[in-house]
């Protein structure tokens, strides 16, 4: 998406066929709710994806500050995505925060890390006051710059654009999208404006194959890897290899999560670890 593009976000409250909403809102771009906690699935999600141009999917979080619950919710989300590929997966964090800001932040980052390790671009959605009260958002944006989608409404009048209400923009660093209304059309519909161009150029392609940069072209075409790698000494920690990128893993719990979803854990000599790691871009 480009700056000043619009998109709508929808859930099971909308119909399976999004054509009427697209025609009335003026955009076919959507972000679709797929799951909530580990108990709710939007049964319309696939149909909604099929009748629109989805740019992302979202999960409504209930994990608060519980990192283990965050992990289970991330896996549940990933296991129930519609078949249409997207770049963005969104964490909707607007209820059930604990009183421990650091616990909330750590759980959020754990969820986003799992999303990133699957090759998607994680996005954090919420409201500014709720975020500032419950989350150390600087930690989130330090790891995932420009990853914020913030909702803030001037009123509940029908507003197809944010013209005339920019004074209500939730001034924060790293805001990629602004959800400026929940009433883009009569009868309620969330609509957002894009503030930053997408920072990728390729067709959406979530993690399915991971190619080794050191292999030949023919080998790259046939080889698939899903690995968490550590050195024999353990001094270098763990890394995951995702879409030709190496991603440091700070939490051993992330390794356990990746193993649950099919990643192989390998251990190599320290020198080999360094050589392999250098073969991948960050």
Task: Place the predicted regions along the sequence by residue.
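Functionally critical loop-and-helix segments that line ligand-binding/catalytic clefts
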Residues: 1-14, 19-24, 141-220
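Conserved beta-strand termini and adjacent loop/short-helix elements that scaffold enzyme active sites
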Residues: 60, 125-127, 180, 230, ...
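Short acidic/glycine-rich loop or secondary-structure boundary segments that cap or lie
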Residues: 67, 132-134, 248-253
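Polar/charged alpha-helical tracts
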Residues: 16-20, 24, 79, 138, ...
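Substrate-binding cleft of extracellular glycoside hydrolase catalytic domains
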Residues: 2-121
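Catalytic domains of cell-wall/extracellular-matrix polysaccharide-remodeling enzymes
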Residues: 87-165
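Short, surface-exposed polybasic-aromatic patches that bind anionic ligands, especially phosphate groups
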Residues: 216-282
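Ordered hydrophobic segments in well-structured contexts
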Residues: 7-9, 29-33, 56-58, 90, ...
